[in-house]
Amino acid sequence: MLIDGHGRTVDYLRVSVTERCNFRCQYCMPEKPFSWVPKENLLSFEELFLFMKVAMDEGVNKIRITGGEPLLREDLDSFIKMIHDYKPDIDLALTTNAYLLPQTAQKLKDAGLKRLNISLDSLKPEVAHQIAQKDVLGQVLKGIDKALEVGLGVKINMVPLKGINDNEILDVMEYCMDRNIKIRFIEYMENRHALEALKGMHGKEILSKVKEKYTIHALGREGASPSFNYTIEENGYEFGLIDPHKHDFCESCNRIRLTAEGFLIPCLYFDEALSIAEAVKKGDIEEASQVLATVLKDKPKENRWIEGELEEGQEVSSRAFYETGG
């Protein structure tokens, strides 16, 4: 069992397999040029898996594959099969923008993937184009349909932005409602890589939009999930809200993150990280385990953000979320 320095059990590992992405979303990497970390700097699937076996043997029972856009990494289904074959009962999920799902969903399902989290910020082609800086909506919707068709579990993530897609909160939720998909609204996470002019919506503002049409009741958090859940009285539909400016989900945080280059990150909102790359490249499991132990010991008690409006002196993450699957 993995225990951090504050007594929390860590049983969830998020693994980024690439920083590359085929979108240029305004809240993530709008001005990132199409230049990338050289392939030789990335850990191979075998090297990533070497560390992941250590984590699974020590009690990790949930793994999420992220990016960038993980479906851009060649032979991803083979990597997923490696994980599934080693521990068939592991909760194995993937976060994606769904653009490549029409041609990959079946292979992912066959390899052992169980669930997907998919970003869907708009149902209007022109707004989706504005956010992603690419004509994406038609292909994304096809990807969602294909995932459902092959039997993958699907959740939708939406980041409401003032003046851009804030008038679509109900539309996107009802799209999910019609398909029996859970949606989680995510407060925009300030970071130095995003478009400076962006303004996100506070959780209370998001809920007020839902309340314009529906009566909602708070359900609370489910386990260690950062999502606070609500139910709609009129039809029993359940949705979630992820509000990272609060600290109330930090007390039950159960996750660590591994980047494609081998950096082990204790918290998404901290810049500190230690590398396991040298250890796994030489097959030194003991050294990799020692790095893991240090990261767990130093895992922070809570994030550095503050609830409410961003104020002078408040932390703005310099972490590139496309490197860590933010």
From Swiss-Prot:
Any GO BP: Mo-molybdopterin cofactor biosynthetic process
UniProt superkingdom: Bacteria
EC number assigned by the record: 4.1.99.22
Pathway: Cofactor biosynthesis; molybdopterin biosynthesis
Stored SMART domains: Elp3
Reaction(s) catalysed by this chain's protein: GTP + AH2 + S-adenosyl-L-methionine = (8S)-3',8-cyclo-7,8-dihydroguanosine 5'-triphosphate + 5'-deoxyadenosine + L-methionine + A + H(+)
Cofactor info, note text: Binds 2 [4Fe-4S] clusters. Binds 1 [4Fe-4S] cluster coordinated with 3 cysteines and an exchangeable S-adenosyl-L-methionine and 1 [4Fe-4S] cluster coordinated with 3 cysteines and the GTP-derived substrate.
Residues that, per the record, bind [4Fe-4S] cluster 2: 250, 253, 267
Binding-site positions, [4Fe-4S] cluster 1: 21, 25, 28
Disulphide bridges: none
Pfam families listed in its UniProt record: Fer4_12, Mob_synth_C, Radical_SAM
Annotated PROSITE patterns: MOAA_NIFB_PQQE (PS01305), RADICAL_SAM (PS51918)
Binding site for GTP: 14, 64, 95, 155, 255-257
GO molecular function annotations of the record: 4 iron, 4 sulfur cluster binding; cyclic pyranopterin monophosphate synthase activity; GTP 3',8'-cyclase activity; GTP binding; metal ion binding; S-adenosyl-L-methionine binding
UniProt-listed InterPro entries: Aldolase_TIM, Elp3/MiaA/NifB-like_rSAM, MoaA, MoaA_NifB_PqqE_Fe-S-bd_CS, MoaA_twitch, MoCo_biosynth_MoaA/MoaC, rSAM
Record domain Radical SAM core: where: 5-227
List of residues binding S-adenosyl-L-methionine: 27, 68, 119, 189
Keywords: 4Fe-4S, GTP-binding, Iron, Iron-sulfur, Lyase, Metal-binding, Molybdenum cofactor biosynthesis, Nucleotide-binding, S-adenosyl-L-methionine
Cofactor(s) in the UniProt record: [4Fe-4S] cluster
Function description: Catalyzes the cyclization of GTP to (8S)-3',8-cyclo-7,8-dihydroguanosine 5'-triphosphate.
Similarity-based family: Belongs to the radical SAM superfamily. MoaA family.
NCBIfam families: moaA
Subunit structure: Monomer and homodimer.
Protein name in the entry: GTP 3',8-cyclase
Species lineage: Bacteria, Pseudomonadati, Campylobacterota, Epsilonproteobacteria, Campylobacterales
